[in-house]
Amino acid sequence: MHDLKAIRETPEAFDLALARRRLEPRSALVLDLDSQRRAVQTELNDLQARRNEASKRIGLVKKEGGDAQALVDEVAGIKATMAALEARLGDLDRDLDGHLMGLPNILDDGVPEGPDESANVEVRRWGTPRAFEFTPRQHFEIGESLGGMDFEAAARLSGARFVVLKGQIARLERALGQFMLDLHITEHGYQEVQTPVLVRAPALQGTGQLPKFAEDLFRVEGDFFLIPTAEVTVTNLVAGQVLAATALPLRMTAFTQCFRSEAGAAGKDTRGMIRQHQFEKVEMVSIVHPDDSAAELERMTACAEDVLKRLELPYRVMALCAGDVGFSARQTYDLEVWLPGQDRYREISSCSNTGDFQARRMNGRFKVEGEKGTRFVHTLNGSGVAVGRCLVAVLENYQNADGTVSVPEALRGYMGGLERLGD
């Protein structure tokens, strides 16, 4: 959600900010609705005062034994007019909120310009892709040859973009999630939370998935949606809350199933586990003081990088350009891991600073003791990391010529000391 006061004061700046995202100017429309709403509210306030005054006069006239019918009729007329204006005010509120809810966040000044992902800027890279003495296979070939990935069984059960994992590979995925969670809790200062995977629409509105991206969500019977990411539930833990400034920063992490319809992904990554309807992810969420959110984004990104470093997976960090930053974010770094089977880097984590955009939508605030009023918190979220894609990266980077897969040292304690899959 956007700050109406800021739009009133600097409408040109608001339109220029939207232009960075290749959007048409919207300040005139927003301010017109705002002006109409304020005019109706002023008229309602005036009528309220007239009604109160007339009601007092009715009491005085009746007390003196006079005829108050004219005043009674006047009050009735005022009430009827007010009812119509209140309905009009409700319509204007919904229209204004609808327009504001459909507009993306204002980008940080440091976000690179560009129309799409082709203009993203590499910030740094870590690790050197392994030189194979054989042609590396893709993860689904490895998984099927080890008897640990069954896409046909998943298709019989649920259709396309699902997988059944078995045996050592199922255990490896579980180990990855547990490793990530333990790392963030014990060394990165995050508190583990377990949240529902079913949420109501207001939670999705708060983080920005609704109303604009309804087609990307799975809706179940009743008022529930399956979460596309634990960002939704974990961030909404501060919805409607006023936190003490001393409680900030609040850092939380969750390991959940995630569900996405992949409505715009027809024909993309149709084989394997890169793009699925159901997948596991470890999510990091930070709730911070506005002055600290820029530094927190760097910290969060480093926490996600630490996962890949400890697994010794080569990766690069990309600063997303204006045309590629997500709806709710003001700035985003993507971590892309090297996949030798595809001979390319693929996204495995996205870390974003949303500023006060989500906080305004969900009314998450903080208060400094001794100061008047409250302020909106800043919220950040990041994958720490996508577990399924990390499994893909491990299988491809640690594959051996004999068809086995070496287990990264960081995971062997979670695998009962197992050193190789397929032995």
Curated annotation (Swiss-Prot):
Gene (UniProt): serS
Disulfide bond sites: none
Subcellular location: Cytoplasm
Protein name: Serine--tRNA ligase
Annotated binding of ATP, by residue: 260-262, 347-350
Main location: cytoplasm
Organism the protein comes from: Rhodospirillum rubrum (strain ATCC 11170 / ATH 1.1.1 / DSM 467 / LMG 4362 / NCIMB 8255 / S1)
Keyword Ligase tagged: yes
Similarity comment text for this entry: Belongs to the class-II aminoacyl-tRNA synthetase family. Type-1 seryl-tRNA synthetase subfamily.
Single annotated GO MF: serine-tRNA ligase activity
